[in-house]
């Protein structure tokens, strides 16, 4: 193998070129690559945190929705109970009012019946007295007595 000055010059130039690249070109390239790797890593970590935050927010929203539905169900049940209670109270009040009205009407009917009986007794007594007077005034004729009694019965 013949080594001549050209090969030796090329080897020295190559070593100087490698040293120059290692000293001045390689460090900025490595710094840029490391910076880019760090940015990508931070971006991925940020995306992962954002995904976890989103999952947590969705879970919280789901929990709040469930709580709201449960509270709404409780409110609906309370409203239904209150409605039933109001209906029962209204029915009881209406029943009491009906009983009161029926009792008043029955009392009025009884009072009217009693008054009518008293009036009828007075009229019967007056008619009996009038009939007795007529019987006494007339002769004791059987046909006349029977006629007067028939008239009295018809008037009663």
UniProtKB/Swiss-Prot annotation:
Keywords: ATP synthesis, Cell inner membrane, Cell membrane, CF(0), Hydrogen ion transport, Ion transport, Membrane, Transmembrane, Transmembrane helix, Transport. Gene3D superfamilies: F1F0 ATP synthase subunit B, membrane domain (1.20.5.620). CDD domains: ATP-synt_Fo_b. It is a single-pass membrane protein. GO terms for cellular component: plasma membrane; proton-transporting ATP synthase complex. GO terms for molecular function: proton-transporting ATP synthase activity, rotational mechanism; proton-transporting ATPase activity, rotational mechanism. The chain crosses the membrane at residues 11-31. It is found in: Cell inner membrane. F(1)F(0) ATP synthase produces ATP from ADP in the presence of a proton or sodium gradient. F-type ATPases consist of two structural domains, F(1) containing the extramembraneous catalytic core and F(0) containing the membrane proton channel, linked together by a central stalk and a peripheral stalk. During catalysis, ATP synthesis in the catalytic domain of F(1) is coupled via a rotary mechanism of the central stalk subunits to proton translocation. Belongs to the ATPase B chain family. NCBIfam families: ATP_synt_b, PRK05759.1-2, PRK05759.1-4. F-type ATPases have 2 components, F(1) - the catalytic core - and F(0) - the membrane proton channel. F(1) has five subunits: alpha(3), beta(3), gamma(1), delta(1), epsilon(1). F(0) has three main subunits: a(1), b(2) and c(10-14). The alpha and beta chains form an alternating ring which encloses part of the gamma chain. F(1) is attached to F(0) by a central stalk formed by the gamma and epsilon chains, while a peripheral stalk is formed by the delta and b chains. This is ATP synthase subunit b. The lineage of its organism: Bacteria, Pseudomonadati, Pseudomonadota, Gammaproteobacteria, Enterobacterales. The gene is atpF.
């Amino acid at each position: 193998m013949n080594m001549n000055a050209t090969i030796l010059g090329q080897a020295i130039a190559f070593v100087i070129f490698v040293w120059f690249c290692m000293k001045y070109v390689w460090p900025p390239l490595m710094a840029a690559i490391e910076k880019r790797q760090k940015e990508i890593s931070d971006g991925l970590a940020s995306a992962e945190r954002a995904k976890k935050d989103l999952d947590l927010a969705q879970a919280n929203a789901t929990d709040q929705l469930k709580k709201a539905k449960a509270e709404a169900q409780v409110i609906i049940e309370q409203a239904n109970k209150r409605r039933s209670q109001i209906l029962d109270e209204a029915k009881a009040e209406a029943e009491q009012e009906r009983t009161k009205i029926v009792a008043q009407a029955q009392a009025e009917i009884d009072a009217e019946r009693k008054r009518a009986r008293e009036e009828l007794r007075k009229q019967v007594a007056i008619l009996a007295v009038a009939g007795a007077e007529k019987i006494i005034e007339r002769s004791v004729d059987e046909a006349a007595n029977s006629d007067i009694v028939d008239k009295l019965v018809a008037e009663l």
